[in-house]
Amino acid sequence: MKVIPLASESLGVRSLATYVKTKDVGILIDPGVALAPDRYGLKPNDIEFEKLREMRNKINDYAKKSNVITISHYHYDHYTPFFDDIYLESKDYAKELYKDKILLIKHPTEFINKSQMNRAKKFLESVKDIAKKIEFADNKTFKFGKTEIKFSPPFPHGRDDKLGYVLITTVKEGKFKFMHTSDTQGIIFDDIRDYIIKEKPNLILMGGPPTYLMHRYGKKNLEKTNENLKYIVENTGAELIIDHHLLRDKKFREKINVDFKTVAEFLGEKNLLLEAYRKEIKQGKDINELFG
């Protein structure tokens, strides 16, 4: 199995898009990318928009290699909608992305909040005549040759269900398992921790806790996440990649008490935290000095 994370905060955008290739099938997980409309009272800079376009093109290139596309939930950094927005630049990419693909997606009306339900409805109206097949994936397993794609029951997006629910995706080929936890925002809940341990993945790509919003996330939730991360590593031995919300925090490394790599580090690249350092970039500081 080959696992290639495509876009994330450590690569300069909001995303957790990932490509997985097995002998049987090419899988594109959560093919979305976006920019924060506002951070520190600042709009995205030209460098961020360049990265957005670069990552959109990369995701669409890997879509051409994919038979299956999965969507864990309906936030714009996890799927590509059929409308345009300055912080998404998605309209021209969506039709090409989903054309003739098998879509394994979060249920559009069950365990979902109102905002995402509306997005899912519009998405399905646009994609139904383009995709090869559409399956609602919640708590189901799909087989492609000897490859299994397993989806969890819906789990809360973060510390409660106000932001809806997400699916954890696990791809198994032979004895190797790759798990994409999507926006569980760290591991606050024991049932998510126990689900991960039961699956015994070898490699986990996790959307980390939003420590840049500690006033909302809370110290106790971060302590619980660190406790559960330690327990997961001890009981699975999995290699851990943590990115997404966590990498919106300049001091991300000191917030997590287990060994992990960012997506950029996993790929052998430098962390490029464009959103977290938007203020410094606005002040004219050199990117090579910030991230060199």
From Swiss-Prot:
It comes from the Archaea. One of its GO terms (molecular function) is hydrolase activity. Coiled coil: none annotated. Disulfide bonds: none annotated. InterPro entries: RibonucZ/Hydroxyglut_hydro (IPR036866), UPF0173_UPF0282_UlaG_hydrolase (IPR050114), UPF0282_hydrls (IPR014426). Belongs to the UPF0282 family. This is UPF0282 protein MJ1629.
